[in-house]
């Protein structure tokens, strides 16, 4: 029986709560309240209502006929998280956590964001539930994603630009944690991925696993059996964990996580924590990180801002360790190829993050052959990446 995290908040050797004493109380309070609400049918009902009526669940599991034909291998299905309100899976988690905030009697939320997607999703849910919202964002990311910064402000959030360190996601998380320590009485920290100290990896996983539960039901309806493989991109890892987790006991289903290979693992310029990192401690958890011998966090690189995190969620670290999932990488070049391929074959423009999964799923489908079934978690749409991709792709015609 797979039963993680344990009562100490560990996923095997990974996870835990490596935080200052001042945050221990907040984490314990959060866990207690969360466990109470998890078994409260009223809370579940409210959550389901907003996911359905506001976010647009369930999302379709779409048979990608043209892509399947092009690849000439297994049948390829797309789990269409890109069709959700705000354009990505992030909203599943922010609606859940903002509801949680209201139930805890808190009036203010803070969040960190890299690509801006989680920031927008948090600002959206905050507007919906009437919460004050502050989003921390690294200066470099804010420049890359100026549109999302404007979106957050439009939704009533205050955007705090972080100018320290590498001015990216890791620094935004550090600032958000500082804010939380100071304002813990009034504020809930909406973490955007399956990372951070316990109970966050568990909470985010639970809110995202609606993806996998729906997928399981839909594929059984369409094919009468489970898929041979599920492919998802992995940064911090919430979209992947969301689709993987409900299949963890189904040993016949291969789970494949695709990390950001950047310019290639051998160059050192990537964001592949499992494939190219080592075990360490950051942001309150023990997991795989990109670090040097002294444990100093290394700069990351990916064409996709949303995969640009120097670590990975502890449950993915466990999945890797117990070989329940296989982790691989796709380079920037390959991601661009996946981006273009899905647009041309299916008329669907994926987020650059999701494009990493698309291109690897093509390989998997070829290996499995005609009798196989592959599901790609299409975690988001590509609108946010247009300006960025225009610099890299020259299109004829």
Swiss-Prot record:
Keyword Iron-sulfur found: no
Reaction equation(s) it catalyzes: (1S,2R)-1-C-(indol-3-yl)glycerol 3-phosphate + L-serine = D-glyceraldehyde 3-phosphate + L-tryptophan + H2O
Any one annotated GO CC term: cytoplasm
EC numbers: 4.2.1.20
Pfam families given in the database record: PALP
Cofactor: pyridoxal 5'-phosphate
Keyword hit for Lipid metabolism: no
CDD domains: Trp-synth_B
Record field: transmembrane: none
Keyword terms: Amino-acid biosynthesis, Aromatic amino acid biosynthesis, Lyase, Pyridoxal phosphate, Tryptophan biosynthesis
Residue list for modification N6-(pyridoxal phosphate)lysine: 90
Assembly behavior: Tetramer of two alpha and two beta chains.
Free-text function comment from the UniProt entry: The beta subunit is responsible for the synthesis of L-tryptophan from indole and L-serine.
Official protein name in the record: Tryptophan synthase beta chain 1
């Amino acid at each position: 029986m797979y039963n993680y995290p344990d009562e100490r908040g560990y996923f095997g050797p990974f996870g835990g709560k490596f935080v200052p004493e001042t945050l221990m109380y907040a984490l314990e309070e959060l866990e207690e309240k969360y466990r109470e609400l998890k078994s409260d049918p009223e809370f579940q009902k409210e959550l389901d209502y907003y996911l359905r009526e506001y976010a647009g669940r369930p999302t379709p599991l779409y048979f990608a006929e043209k892509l399947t034909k092009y690849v000439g291998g297994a049948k390829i299905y797309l789990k269409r998280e890109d069709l959700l309100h705000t354009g990505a899976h992030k909203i599943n988690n922010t609606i859940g956590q903002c509801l949680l905030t209201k139930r805890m009697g808190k009036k203010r939320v803070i969040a960190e964001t890299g690509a801006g997607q989680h920031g927008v999703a948090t600002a959206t849910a905050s507007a919906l539930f009437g919460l004050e919202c502050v989003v921390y964002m690294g200066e470099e990311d804010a420049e890359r994603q100026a549109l999302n910064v404007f979106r957050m402000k439009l939704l009533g959030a205050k955007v705090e630009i972080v100018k320290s360190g590498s001015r990216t996601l890791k620094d935004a998380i550090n600032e958000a944690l500082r804010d939380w320590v100071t304002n813990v009485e009034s504020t809930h920290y909406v973490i955007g991925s399956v990372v951070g100290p316990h109970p966050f990896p568990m909470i985010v996983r639970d809110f995202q696993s609606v993806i996998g539960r729906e997928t399981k039901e839909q594929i059984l309806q369409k094919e009468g059996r489970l898929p041979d493989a599920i492919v998802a991109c992995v940064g911090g890892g919430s979209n992947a964990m969301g689709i993987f987790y409900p299949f963890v006991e189904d040993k016949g289903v291969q789970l494949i996580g695709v990390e950001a290979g950047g310019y290639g693992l051998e160059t050192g310029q990537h964001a592949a924590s499992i494939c190219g990192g080592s075990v360490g401690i950051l942001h309150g958890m023990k997991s795989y990180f990109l670090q040097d011998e002294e444990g100093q966090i290394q700069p990351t690189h990916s064409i996709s801002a949303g995969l640009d995190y120097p670590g990975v969620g502890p449950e993915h670290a466990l999945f890797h360790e117990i070989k329940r999932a296989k982790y691989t990488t796709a380079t920037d070049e390959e991601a661009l190829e996946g981006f273009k391929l899905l647009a041309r074959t299916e008329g669907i423009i994926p987020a650059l993050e999701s494009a990493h999964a698309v291109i690897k799923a093509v390989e998997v489908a070829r290996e499995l052959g005609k009798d196989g079934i592959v599901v790609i978690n299409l975690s988001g749409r590509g609108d946010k990446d247009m300006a960025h991709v225009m610099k890299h792709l020259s299109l004829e015609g």
